[in-house]
Amino acid sequence: MKKINLKDKEIEKIINNEQQRQEEHIELIASENYVSKDVLEATGSILTNKYSEGYPGARYYDGCEFVDQIETLAIERLKKLFNVKFANVQPHSGSSANSAAIAALVKPGGKILGMSLDAGGHLTHGYKISFSGTFYDPYFYGVNDEGLLDYDVIEKLAEKIKPELIICGASNYSRTIDFEKFSKIAKKVGAFLLADIAHIAGLIIADLHPSPVGHADVITSTTHKTIRGARGGIIMSNDETLMKKIDRWVFPGYQGGPLVHVIAGKAVAFGEALTPQFKKYQQQIISNAKAFSEEFKKVGTKIISGQTDNHLFTIDVKSSFNISGKEASELMHSINITANKNSIPNDTLGPKISSGVRMGTPAMTTRGFKEVEFKKLARIIIELLANSTSSNLESLKLKLKNEVLELTKAFPTKDYYL
């Protein structure tokens, strides 16, 4: 991609250094991706100059006729993608979306039941350092010994706790989520159901994962992971009464003026997601993840839950390579492979060290990786981690880094990916 040219040379240098890092590194962080040139240009447009508190047709500022058109188009495209009646595209992030949705569904101090962090949940699903664990009364469900959701156990827990809200969805769960079963549990105990599909939204759009529409009362997501759009959040529902409450919590509850330039980037990405190419891309993401994980399994590497049904998986590096997640991710970074340490179920090392490393395929699939490249990448990572205490580690790292650079040169970042 073309390097940026600014009058502010300090910022120019840093941005161009980051661009070079992105070009020369293999990106395995499951929550990251590369946007198209069109998304990038819309997000960096003159729309950043316009303030537009409120919603289309009901703004507190004049001169919003064109930003109204953009936000309306984003909403209509999003509704079409997920076949929903109502949508809000203003949240600045997935966390912002969750905060507004939860506030609309539960009063402060109310009970919420979400997935525990070490089992694959997210901070905003009730973790103590998040708003959801500070202003609400959080409880958690986990996974069984196989790393799978046990819906019978979750049902019994819900019957005991009687939460006002159940949150389903995860930031690190590699298997299919049964939204219908969650819905039955929520209805049985009289709870609202919130589906956080931030990681799997693109797969749902492509009909490669069951949709929560028709099962969840409210659906939240980010727009920059598998949707491959501008960074932000969205909220959807088929319940008009709930959606009106959510809209009020987004604005004026938690946010002021929306980021119109980001909403434009979201709208462009939603348009791209409506194309046949987008479904092929999502299919390749899953095929790559399966091939990638199977290559690790060939040498006995432990995959949490045993396999992947989606775009990510986590390897237990502690039991497989006798190395912590922090050490493993730092080693990988030293040879230009970017991933992230991640807690695993019943992790004894804590989130800052952890026993796992999460692997995601969306970003490198965008750059053109197929199964053969991911298999080669797995072998590079295995060789690195298996020799973490070798006396020849530095020379090995140099060799493997050169192999990584060969891959990144063969699959450069491009101006347009579709």
From Swiss-Prot:
| Pathway assigned to this chain's UniProt record | One-carbon metabolism; tetrahydrofolate interconversion; Amino-acid biosynthesis; glycine biosynthesis; glycine from L-serine: step 1/1
Sequence positions bearing N6-(pyridoxal phosphate)lysine: K225
Question: According to the UniProt record, what class of enzyme is this?
Answer: transferase
* Residues that bind (6S)-5,6,7,8-tetrahydrofolate: L117, G121, H122, L123
Q: What is this protein called?
A: Serine hydroxymethyltransferase
A GO MF term:
pyridoxal phosphate binding
Residues the UniProt record annotates as site (Plays an important role in substrate specificity) = H224
Where found in the cell? Cytoplasm
Under CDD domains, the record lists: SHMT (cd00378)
